[in-house]
Amino acid sequence: MDVLPSSYRLLAALPARITSRRPLPSQLRALRTSPPQWRFTNIRAISASAPKIDRSKSKLFKDADEAVADIQPGSTILSAGFGLCGVADTLIQAMKKRGPKSLHSLTAVSNNAGIEDVGGLAHLTKNGQVEKLIISFLGNNKALEKQYLSGGIEIELCPQGTLAERIRAGGAGIPAFYTPTAVDTLVAEGKVPAKFNEEGKVVGYGKKREVREFGGKRYLMEEALTGDVAIVRAARVDEAGNCVFRYTTKAFGPIMAKAARLTIVEAEEIVPIGTFDANDIDLPGIFVDRIVPSTAPKNIEVKKLREEESASTSSTTNPPSSNKISSRERIARRAAKELKHGYYCNLGVGIPTLAASFVPPSIKVWLQSENGILGMGPYPTERELDADIINAGKETVTLLPGASTFDSAESFGMIRGGHVDVSILGALQVSASGDLANYMVPGKVFKGMGGAMDLVSNPEATKVVVATEHMAKDGSSKIVGECNLPLTGARCVSTIITELCVFEVNRQRGRLTLTEMAPGVSVSQVRGATDAKFEVSPDLRSME
């Protein structure tokens, strides 16, 4: 006869032991008669400033006025969009309608602050409803600029990629992270002006960052950003809150929706549940709490067009037609040679963007725009114009066959992660060590750094090329021994291209080597125009 192990007999008897009635201790007997101290509910409210969310009710609201009616003063608002593209103007106008007595002291987080009397957060800042902004760039908002410099509003300026990652981290429940962006800059030191008094004197600065070393490289610790309310514009939304975005409107929309305690989406089209294929959804409905119809028109910040007959599938601009080569054209022509077949490239505004015009048709490059495009094409014709497709300079552009669009966190992950082969930027100053200054001149209006600090954050993987005129407007050299302007990045530039010559930079040794000269230019002429010391390559050649 088989005998069961004692452990088995104990397990078999366990249910009976658990469910049998036994006398309770007196203290537990007292608790048994008291009402429970918990309850299940469909209502969710995490922050005192965040409106309550009732999961049992429909997400559809009659209009924007109803959807923003319970936003509290002092709330943090995450406002999606890039420039004027993808901005939730219907919701912003409804918030403005409530007025500064009902809705005030707001902290607003966005990439830009819009344009006065046109669109974006400018409606709220002009109305005195915003106390603090967290943005990467002021843009063309003169009224906000004046308000900032006279103490009317506090502005925390943050590198664009860092801003996007702080928001993404907030939505993912990650309190902080380390980034190579902005090491050795005013951002790291906590010296970016944030608050002025009425006389225009700086009375407040940004927060100093913690610096830590990983693998021999230094990184800054950045804290996550979350909001009480996110306001987002989407192209199509179903009644469950699933969203579909068009092109570059998704720059900040999806990540902000995930980082807020309550998300309101204004939709150009509201459709029944089941309309979308699951593969087509950009933002799942779990992140959306309220849906309203979008009634505000789309705005275009910088309308750029090309003529029908000059359409090109390999450039973002049209090359100059003059027979005389200007300084800018000479620089752009040489910069184009840095763009090799199959490369993924990011081009800054101005001369760097012009370089794309001189890439031969036989060379295929993929242009990346940090607001969320890979495969950017030329300016559109009037027929091709689409307000939802813009570049990092807020200009209207097109997409080439094979292009993709994505949010800003994805975009700057490509950049910081070293997946971009070449980044070409302009400069105010470049040092012999490859230090770059290109976003701020002390004493002049400071509009922000945008994405420049992110673009130079991984020079070991992404080649950073500076394309700039050799001399500044005041006649001083831009090629210096040491930068005296605030740095965008330290030891990050590998090649410098000017109208006079080309320098290769040894970032480790802090040395410049003259490798090419423009026709008709002498070494002595280059020395006279260059503050930094440099060596001359034994293989010095003509700049083509």
Positions of the model-derived regions?
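Substrate-recognition/specificity elements adjacent to catalytic centers across diverse enzyme folds
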Residues: 350-353
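Conserved phosphate- and dinucleotide-binding cores of soluble alpha/beta proteins
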Residues: 55-62, 68, 83-99, 115-125, ...
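Structural beta-sheet core signal
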Residues: 108-110, 265, 367, 466
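N-terminal glycine-/serine-/threonine-rich phosphate-binding loop
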Residues: 38-108, 307-344, 364-365
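Catalytic or ion-translocation cores adjacent to nucleophile or general acid/base/metal-coordination motifs
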Residues: 109, 366-380
